[in-house]
Amino acid sequence: MSNFSPREIVSELDRFIIGQKDAKRAVAIALRNRWRRQQLEGQMREEVMPKNILMIGPTGVGKTEISRRLAKLAGAPFVKVEATKFTEVGYVGRDVEQIIRDLVEIAITLVREKRREDVKAKAHLNAEERVLDALVGKTASPATRDSFRKKLRNGEMDDKEIEIEVSDSGASPNFEIPGMPGANIGVLNISDMLGKAMGGRTKTRKTTVKDSYPILINDESDKLLDQDQIVQEALRVSEDEGIVFIDEIDKIAAREGGSGAGVSREGVQRDLLPLVEGTTVATKYGPVKTDHILFITSGAFHVSKPSDLLPELQGRLPIRVELSALTREDFRRILTETEASLIKQYIALMETEEVKLEFSDDAIDALADIAVDLNATVENIGARRLQTVIEKVLDEISFTAPDKAGATFIIDAAYVKEKIGGLAKNTDLSRFIL
């Protein structure tokens, strides 16, 4: 797990997300608290519970983006789900315990990648031996092998085609048993056992020497790793460092005046309660305790209010953060300051066609103005409006770019207004086009 300080986490998030200081601070403190808890000993470590977060704010202001960037920073198992995808236990559909099962799968992948790095050097040597076997056969003399080894290391054999045998980890069928969530457990374990009993299946692949290395290194790494140890480590990492991000939580809040609990509304909230509070979920790798998993939830709360959530669930999301709507200045900064801003993306895309794009300052102002106006008059969809506007402005250039290699286009305010000004003024039209 990464040990960034809260200040470092916030400055890292600042590279990609404009504004929203409160939300960044809240997630930075929550992430740092995971690390602080790891430093504690014994009973106190068990007692410290994560403070779950509820992010409230209109669509397109950075709630989901904060969680995505946080996951990359954390170096911890992270799963993002939409609350609307789940139904109450006992009904057709996914139940919320599937979130934890997915988290464990992600943790196993993470741990395996880390362990593979540790044994990479030895795996590389073993892979080289297998490539030599494929090139000159196992019975070749040491002198022949050495001469081919030199050629291999010099890259002279990179394009030669060889046949290699690799273990076949063909995806085993994953059957859900109706009425028994998570009952695909049995099927997978049976196929695992059959694989072990038969000494593991292998399949032959044709590939070039250069392309065979990554495949063989992975294959050899897995032979050097203890799978049971990986699973045990992954279960521990899931329990201690796991982060679950639940988006669209406002969509499962009971609407005012609505009747009935609703299978995918209040029922899902009731199922989430024990998960957020701390329970034990059965997975095919073993039981996972959710006491120390950090839950970050977010919602726009356009129709419902946070107080429409079940009181018990509200109590389990003690940290509330409001994200503010974006201003004209925010839009300007999104276009110019973020590390992979839309403008930089379009310039890079056009460079592949040898077309040069240049945006003047007044063009950026015009784009920001139009985005703000449309959000105010049509529907507020936050920063996503910029994608719609820029796409419309650059439509002609994108279409004709292959025929204009070597050309330079300067986008200024006049060009923006020419392409989009009329549409933006006509509210009825812009409802459909922008």
Curated annotation (Swiss-Prot):
Pfam families: AAA, AAA_2, ClpB_D2-small. GO terms for biological process: protein unfolding; proteolysis involved in protein catabolic process. InterPro entries: AAA+_ATPase (IPR003593), ATP-dep_Clp_protease_ClpX (IPR050052), ATPase_AAA_core (IPR003959), Clp_ATPase_C (IPR019489), HslU (IPR004491), P-loop_NTPase (IPR027417). ATP binds at residues 18, 60-65, 247, 312, 384. Coiled coil: none annotated. GO terms for molecular function: ATP binding; ATP hydrolysis activity; peptidase activity; proteasome-activating activity. The keyword Nucleotide-binding applies. The keyword Phosphoprotein does not apply. Its main location: cytoplasm. GO terms for cellular component: HslUV protease complex. Keywords: ATP-binding, Chaperone, Cytoplasm, Nucleotide-binding, Stress response. It is found in: Cytoplasm. ATPase subunit of a proteasome-like degradation complex; this subunit has chaperone activity. The binding of ATP and its subsequent hydrolysis by HslU are essential for unfolding of protein substrates subsequently hydrolyzed by HslV. HslU recognizes the N-terminal part of its protein substrates and unfolds these before they are guided to HslV for hydrolysis. Belongs to the ClpX chaperone family. HslU subfamily. A double ring-shaped homohexamer of HslV is capped on each side by a ring-shaped HslU homohexamer. The assembly of the HslU/HslV complex is dependent on binding of ATP. NCBIfam families: hslU (TIGR00390), PRK05201.1 (NF003544). This is ATP-dependent protease ATPase subunit HslU. It comes from Brucella abortus (strain 2308). The gene is hslU.
